[in-house]
């Protein structure tokens, strides 16, 4: 049952690709939401296992489900297809191997309707396939209480990978549909596409409401995109998006700590990209033919130095959102001065 004072459909976009083992749990958690006014859009991205059958079976059970079948084009294209079909007042995303608490959407929409913000974001519990908690962000000081961030505050807490406390993904957030008009995922990129989409939402928004409750369960499984280690041409996607982030922030006329954090984030991303390249395990047709991308990473480190000038991030205390860990300072220094040593760190 929906809370009094909250009304309107939430469009939930679920990209589906070969997740037969996990899809039933995901869909049961969505259909079991205490907030009932849902449009559940399943975008089957050309699955070759039993996922298509499961989508059809669940659609027969519940009229709130709409199934869209596409040829395999990747998660970004699938999400964009879902955005085209969305009719709700609010829009959310769930990955098909994840699941959500029963009060996930009721909690988020209640916060949106009682706030002037256009985005609400909740805490995340990362888990392995056995349900055990995985600590993905040790040392991060995530807010322990509900908190509103204006646009620039949200950007500060999002851009620097060493001090990021706002999760980059789209799936632990609920967005005003009005905010998302004209914003789409980058179809040709497969890494950090969530980061780019969320950043552009932040830039357009008036900020967000953060609630610490861990209402979203994020599955980290062997072989998933986030855990893959092979270096390919797609490994430059993060650098592409950090370059775009700097340009978009400059275009918006935002300076001060925000642009400093963006520049620092770009340098750290360049150093990590060069490190992963030097470690090898490359696809033959990929980065060996990407000298321009490698040169862009090197140029960023040689012309920047914001990361080296930034204060050290402290595990317990400190409010310098442009701070950088000692590990990242060393990484940036070695990448700039003796790149081949990166394979050993």
Please place each PLM-identified region on the residue numbering.
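Cell-envelope/extracellular polymer assembly enzymes that use nucleotide-activated donors
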Residues: 8-11, 29, 39, 196
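Short, well-formed alpha-helical segments that are part of the catalytic scaffolds
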Residues: 18-32
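Acidic helix N-cap motif at the loop->helix transition within catalytic regions
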Residues: 24, 38, 49-57, 99, ...
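A conserved acidic beta->alpha catalytic loop
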Residues: 29, 36, 44-53, 71-73, ...
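Glycine-rich, basic loop-to-helix element that forms the pyrophosphate-binding segment
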Residues: 70-86, 99
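Short aromatic/hydrophobic "clamp" motif used to bind/position activated sugar donors
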Residues: 91
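Donor-binding/catalytic cores of nucleotide-activated saccharide
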Residues: 99-208, 218-233
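Membrane-interface aromatic/basic loop that binds lipid-linked glycans or pyrophosphate carriers
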Residues: 278-345
